[in-house]
Amino acid sequence: STDSRNVKHGDVFLAIRGEKFDGHNFITTAVQSGSCVVVVDRRWAEANPAMMVSLNVPKLIVENTVLALGELARLHRRKWRIPVLAVGGSNGKTTTKEMIRQVLSEKFKVLATEGNLNNHIGVPQTMLRLDKSHTIAVVEVGTNHFGEIKYLAEILEPTHGLITNIGHEHLEFFGTIQGVAKAEGEMFDWLRQNKGTALVNRDDSHLSRIS
């Protein structure tokens, strides 16, 4: 878990540094709630030696807890060799993901993103919910910087990928519509390099060019 409020007995707690909160400030709460292992970053561990000693659970020190979360999710995904569909795009990701989930649920046990948890924290959390009961996964992926979709694809190792469209909603991050297409197109690049299947919306001229 990355949220001390949701920790259950036996959980591993990863202390994530976010924009508003630092998970390291909630380690004691997580342990009191039943966490059996805490994962902290080296900077915090070196700055808080007394706390490290006082914690009565095993501690794992890593350079970056966000990257550790992603690596755990990647390794966990590899335990279950099931089809994974990644859903990206400027608009309609969540709606498209939910429609696909509903259709596939008629025949398969589907793991799907909850809400729109589609970033470098939400995607690993989704994959860590994967278990032997699931026969397919539908995972939403979002981006606000170059390289993010590639990073998420390396965690998901999708067998299939879908980009809904290329729009102007992310211009503040990528500058031009071509920049948006390049960022979203990282999914198709990954699929191409790893022999995956791209589902292309040919009605979108930008997608036609990058597919």
Question: Where are each of the predicted segments found?
Answer:
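Phosphate-binding loop of NTP-binding sites
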Residues: 66-202, 206-211
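N-terminal leader/targeting and accessory segments in enzymes
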Residues: 1-71
